[in-house]
Curated annotation (Swiss-Prot):
Full protein name: Small ribosomal subunit protein bS6
Keyword terms of this UniProt record: Ribonucleoprotein, Ribosomal protein, RNA-binding, rRNA-binding
The keyword Acetylation is assigned to this record: no
Family: Belongs to the bacterial ribosomal protein bS6 family.
Native organism: Shewanella sp. (strain W3-18-1)
């Protein structure tokens, strides 16, 4: 089996369906005796350019080890799902298991915030003046 990195973008109005889509796609992989090494739901993010007059999309990243037939099945599922705006499947040499830069940045941002998700006045002020 080969290693793959898969990113797909979902229409922002369909964000509530993303957990079900993830479950369905991971089910396809595990049924074929594949392994999911990393799964990250990046949430809604700004697009670099409009796609179908949309400026945001819901991003999901998966690193998997699966047979080529399973990946073809996933690509077909992406193609026939109207909620999936774009997808990219890349073959990789090794399994990637560490957090992506996107996930690390989110973790760092969350750790800087207080328990209620708010930054303290000192943190916000220091950031404003560039300290």
């Amino acid at each position: 089996m080969r290693h793959y990195e898969i990113v797909f973008m979902v229409h922002p109005d369909q964000s509530e369906q993303v957990p079900g889509m993830i479950e369905r796609y991971t089910g396809v992989i595990t049924e074929a005796n594949g392994t999911i090494h990393r799964l990250e739901d990046w949430g809604r993010r700004q697009l670099a350019y409009p796609i179908q007059d949309l400026h945001k999309a819901h991003y999901v990243l998966m690193n998997v080890e699966a047979p080529a037939e399973t990946i073809e099945e996933l690509e077909t599922a992406f193609r026939f799902n109207d909620a999936v705006l774009r997808n990219m499947v890349m073959r990789t040499k090794v399994a990637v298991t560490e957090a992506s830069p996107m996930a690390r940045a989110r973790d760092e941002r969350d750790s800087r915030r207080g328990p209620a998700g708010e930054r303290s006045y000192d943190e916000a002020h220091a950031e404003e003046i560039g300290e």
